[in-house]
Amino acid sequence: MKKLLFLLTTILLVSSTNVMAQQEQNDKKAIKEAKKAAKRAEKLLVFTEASQAMNDRKFLYKIDRVQINNGRFTPTDNRSSFFELNDTVTASQIDTGSTYSTPKLVYGSISDFESSTDKKGNLIVKFVLKEKTSIYPQEVTMKLEYESNECAMTIAEKKGKRTYIRGTIVPLGSEVIFRGTPVIY
């Protein structure tokens, strides 16, 4: 009888411990799923703000990296490297951090603005850029990645040269940037 009572008590303790461990594991899973859902909602909010700013033509593209002539990307200072679009007026400046050059601010205008979405949900914007310092217009393609404000920009010049730029999109007026000396021609 004592053995039976001892066996039942042991089984009861082990089963209650297993139930508590299972409940604790389920709580951890629920917390992990809630964190994932919150992170996904935050990413979607950032993407929605960036895509709305691009469609409204009022955005600031903070440049992180620029592809230089030999094909490698070089980092830039994203507080002073940017492309700004306000309706049809643009301002652009790239600061590679070189001690030999200071950032120059270049103004321009755009035309033929087109916006579309691909199969993955990425926003693709195309337009023609005419800067005041260049006689040739440049075709610009911007691809905003879904659920992010990360954007890839490709600038195609008339002579066939392409420049690839990576950065982030933020609504105009939400970030403070350094503006260099305007280039006047």
Give residue ranges: language-model regions.
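Sec-dependent signal peptide cleavage junction
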Residues: 17-60
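Short hydrophobic/aromatic-rich beta-strand segments that constitute the beta-sheet cores
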Residues: 61, 89-93, 151-155
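Bacterial Sec-dependent N-terminal signal peptides
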Residues: 1-27
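N-terminal post-signal-peptidase region of extra-cytosolic proteins
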Residues: 45, 63-78
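Surface-exposed, interaction-prone regions used to assemble/regulate multi-protein complexes
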Residues: 53-64, 176, 181-184
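Solvent-exposed coil/turn segments that connect beta secondary-structure elements
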Residues: 66, 86-88, 94-96, 147, ...
